């Protein structure tokens, strides 16, 4: 399930609709008052790591990282980072054990522009993956820099 954090009810509704469009329809509720209310209650706020296309490309040349692409199947087929594994963001939780990812190895998540990737990275972190990052700008930013891609076989 997903819980939303939004500063106002309309923003929560808009987010719920946007998530439903990508197959994430298990929204349980929203935090009234958003982050200010959470912080004012003395609650901890977790953050997720991000990486840029250039940094990720350099990492892949060196120590490496697993790449998880959470876009639609058709977008993945058209071109993805070489060696990337694929699962649609809306099916990540149910398919997680089938992906063969190591919970203690680096995993970089990508989507089209970074929104779904951020959500998927959050789900991975919650599932115990310790070195997760979201690719800033997603495949749009990767492709603008003409970094390597491959098409699905």
Can you describe what each PLM-predicted range is?
Residues 1-66, 70-153:
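Rhodanese-like catalytic fold shared by cysteine-dependent sulfurtransferases
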């Amino acid at each position: 399930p997903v819980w939303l954090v939004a500063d106002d009810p309309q923003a929560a509704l808009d987010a719920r609709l946007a998530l439903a469009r990508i197959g994430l329809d298990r929204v349980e509720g929203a935090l009234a008052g958003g982050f200010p209310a959470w912080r004012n209650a003395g609650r901890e706020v977790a953050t997720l790591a991000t990486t840029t296309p250039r940094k990720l490309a350099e990492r892949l040349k060196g120590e490496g990282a697993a790449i998880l692409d959470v876009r639609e199947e058709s977008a993945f087929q058209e071109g993805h980072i070489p060696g990337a594994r694929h699962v649609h963001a809306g099916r990540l939780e149910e398919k997680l054990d089938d992906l063969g990812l190591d919970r203690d190895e680096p995993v970089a998540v990508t989507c089209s522009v970074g929104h779904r990737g951020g959500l998927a990275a959050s789900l991975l972190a919650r599932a115990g993956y310790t070195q997760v990052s979201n690719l800033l700008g997603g495949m749009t930013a990767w492709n603008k820099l003409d970094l390597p891609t491959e098409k699905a076989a």
